[in-house]
Amino acid sequence: MSLNLSRLSLLSSPRISISTHAPRKGYVCCSMKSYRLSELSSSQVDSLKSRPRIDFSSIFATVNPIIDAVRSNGDNAVKEYTERFDKVQLNKVVEDMSELSVPELDSNVKEAFDVAYDNIYAFHLAQKSTEKSVENMKGVRCKRVSRSIGSVGLYVPGGTAVLPSTALMLAIPAQIAGCKTVVLATPPSKDGSICKEVLYCAKRAGVTHILKAGGAQAIAAMAWGTDSCPKVEKIFGPGNQYVTAAKMILQNSEAMVSIDMPAGPSEVLVIADEHASPVYIAADLLSQAEHGPDSQVVLVVVGDSVDLNAIEEEIAKQCKSLPRGEFASKALSHSFTVFARDMIEAISFSNLYAPEHLIINVKDAEKWEGLIENAGSVFIGPWTPESVGDYASGTNHVLPTYGYARMYSGVSLDSFLKFMTVQSLTEEGLRNLGPYVATMAEIEGLDAHKRAVTLRLKDIEAKQLA
């Protein structure tokens, strides 16, 4: 679905028109519409920051019967849907990780995943908070303590691309948090096996079970539980519209399961000035566009000195040689460029758009970090492509999309924890605080609340008089 921008005024100057000239697969990288922020009304800017609407009504109609079937028939339903959708016949739906050996990988591949593991582990371990206890009044002590979520489900997509990096991003914080049961769901290969890179990452990061299924049936199996799949209490991970719909339905069902965040197509917003390399700008835009035809790609140009022709040529050149260039082409067809007078206007628009990924590729990029309010993850400076965060810098790549960065955070260690508050009062504490509580309870007309305090205060007073 493309973004409806028909009521916005296009720039009078030529659009960025991108063509691959001699495409290998019969596709053409489409043009990106262009707009000048200073010429748009506030309502037009609001339209520009809106994402394509997803009509979930038809998707729910498909997903609901799958969820019901898995609830009723468990593993058999998972097998049936896996054969129908993935053309794979499963003998076994769930693998116990303790029974699987660590797969052999090429040394360079193993080293890459090991470096990523170490960086992701270090960054998420540093998120552990120390327990703090506060004495608000004499004898009144309060604290907040954390506990791991007992069982979690991790969804690792396997549709248009295999994503072992997502296994690391989800399993490592679960491992650090101390989640006892960690179920990783991922579509099986045609022979019913698990992608060896995903298996390696899962073993390294402490996954306890692998559910060899994808789509809505995998989400339902983790939410309800089956004979072989443990029921989980929270489900994490990106997926297509059917996966997203299943998560939305199940979090509001009798399954009593929560989810990480709402999800939409992946997206990037790049802010660039005349100091940014056109080669890097093009590469960053295309690295997001290649995710899929529904990816959202936005370029914000600062000032009038950016060489748009050079960017056009680079996008055409790089798109032409990409194996997934057809996906990139379709994504670019509903993407756009906006022109900002300065960095203040550029960042103001970015904060309105609230991108999943925000790249700041301008001179002295670091000094603008303090103005950024809404973004899933930020990449600052010419040497920080989005790819490093996607794979191995240490930050998490499971992030809010679709503008949800205005109110949601990406996956972190806290996502796998729950927090309890604890309070304890001494006799002196209740003498100090109790009368105020009794007064407030009386104002609200809750006499039992009041008595729970006053009965104790009377006993304390009686002991003192004895």
Swiss-Prot record:
Main location: plastid
Binding site for NAD(+): Y155, Q217, N240
InterPro entries per record: Ald_DH/histidinol_DH, Histidinol_DH_CS, Histidinol_DH_monofunct, Hstdl_DH
Binding site residues for Zn(2+): Q288, H291, D390, H449
Cofactor binding note of this UniProt entry: Binds 1 zinc ion per subunit.
Subcellular location: Plastid, Chloroplast
Transit peptide, UniProt annotation: 1-30
Protein's UniProt name: Histidinol dehydrogenase, chloroplastic
Organism, as annotated: Arabidopsis thaliana (Mouse-ear cress)
